[in-house]
Amino acid sequence: MSHPALTRLRALRYFDAIPALEPHLLDWLLLEDSMTKRFEQQGKRVSVTLIREAFVGQSEVEEASGLLPSESRYWLREILLCADGEPWLAGRTVVPESTLCGPEQVLQHLGKTPLGRYLFTSSTLTRDFIEIGRDATLWGRRSRLRLSGKPLLLTELFLPASPLY
């Protein structure tokens, strides 16, 4: 099962450099902290609608080519992050199977827990980059993050109800 928001997320086209945008947009798109926390700061109750969690082959995560190690299996998690029940963000996390050793195995068992609640409590979290993307009227971003040096790719699409707009 997929969702129209995830189709739009996969259609994002990324800028080669950070574009000259309004400060308000850049404030959201370049946020280095947890988007879950940012939504909660808006006075909202944040919840996750889980669309898909499964191991997939390389052909289902082509956007990760060149950004993550080439492996036969990846853990894929697709969600909608909702504020007071309204979808504000679509998220897609691609995790190489080799990342899922040690404490990082918990990434397979997040269920309806927001990814940010786990990632941003880890003292081993680093971010290699943030790229800004756009699909028609919607903005998004992707980041390669590392836990204990092990990579994962997080792509986020800001939906029309999001305060980014």
Curated annotation (Swiss-Prot):
Keywords: Cytoplasm, Lyase, Pyruvate, Ubiquinone biosynthesis. It catalyses: chorismate = 4-hydroxybenzoate + pyruvate. The keyword Disulfide bond does not apply. Substrate binds at M35, R77, L115, E156. It is found in: Cytoplasm. One of its GO terms (biological process) is ubiquinone biosynthetic process. InterPro entries: Chorismate--pyruvate_lyase, Chorismate_lyase_/UTRA_dom_sf. The keyword Hydrolase does not apply. Its EC number is 4.1.3.40. It holds the Pfam family Chor_lyase. Pathway: Cofactor biosynthesis; ubiquinone biosynthesis. Its main location: cytoplasm. GO terms for cellular component: cytosol. It comes from the Bacteria. GO terms for molecular function: chorismate lyase activity. It is an enzyme of class 4 (lyase). Belongs to the UbiC family. Removes the pyruvyl group from chorismate, with concomitant aromatization of the ring, to provide 4-hydroxybenzoate (4HB) for the ubiquinone pathway. Monomer. This is Chorismate pyruvate-lyase. The gene is ubiC.
